[in-house]
Structures are given as C-alpha cells and as structure tokens.
C-alpha cells in the first residue's frame, strides 16, 4: 500500500466551498509565521 498524502497538505482541501470563497482555513498564511509565533499558534494554550 502506498502512503497517502494527508488531507491538510493537499491545496484547497480545507476550503469551505459551500460557504463561499474565503470561508475556509487560510493555508498560505501559516508559512509567514516566525518560529516564535508558531509556538504560540497551538490550539490549546492551557497545555503549553
């Protein structure tokens, strides 16, 4: 079996088409973050 690419890596997979453009998760924005900002970008701050 070949290893499948994760869905969040495929471009446009997170876009919410039924809610119109721009309603989905902004994927390209994540690449702009610095290393320090990435540390504070976790979902749950409580567990840090």
Curated annotation (Swiss-Prot):
Enumerate the InterPro entries for this protein: SASP_SspO
For whether the record's keyword set contains Metal-binding, the answer is no
Q: For this chain's UniProt record, which GO biological process terms are given?
A: asexual sporulation; sporulation resulting in formation of a cellular spore
* Chief subcellular location: other
Q: What induces or represses expression of this protein, per its UniProt record?
A: Expressed only in the forespore compartment of sporulating cells.
Give the superkingdom in one word. Answer: Bacteria
Q: What are the cysteine partners in each disulfide bond?
A: none
Query: Where is the protein found, in the record's own terms?
Result: Spore core
Q: Which UniProt keywords apply?
A: Sporulation
Whether Nucleotide-binding counts among this entry's keywords is no
Region described as Disordered: spans on this chain: 1-23
To which protein family does this belong? Belongs to the SspO family.
NCBIfam families named among the record's database cross-references: spore_sspO
Enumerate the HAMAP family for this protein: SspO (MF_00665)
Q: What is this protein called?
A: Small, acid-soluble spore protein O
The organism is Bacillus pumilus (strain SAFR-032)
Could you read off the lineage of the organism from its UniProt record? Bacteria, Bacillati, Bacillota, Bacilli, Bacillales
């Amino acid at each position: 079996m070949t290893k499948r690419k994760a869905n969040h890596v495929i471009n446009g997979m997170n876009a919410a088409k039924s809610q119109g453009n721009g309603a989905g998760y902004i994927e390209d924005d994540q690449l702009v973050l610095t290393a320090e900002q990435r540390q504070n970008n976790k979902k749950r701050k409580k567990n840090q």
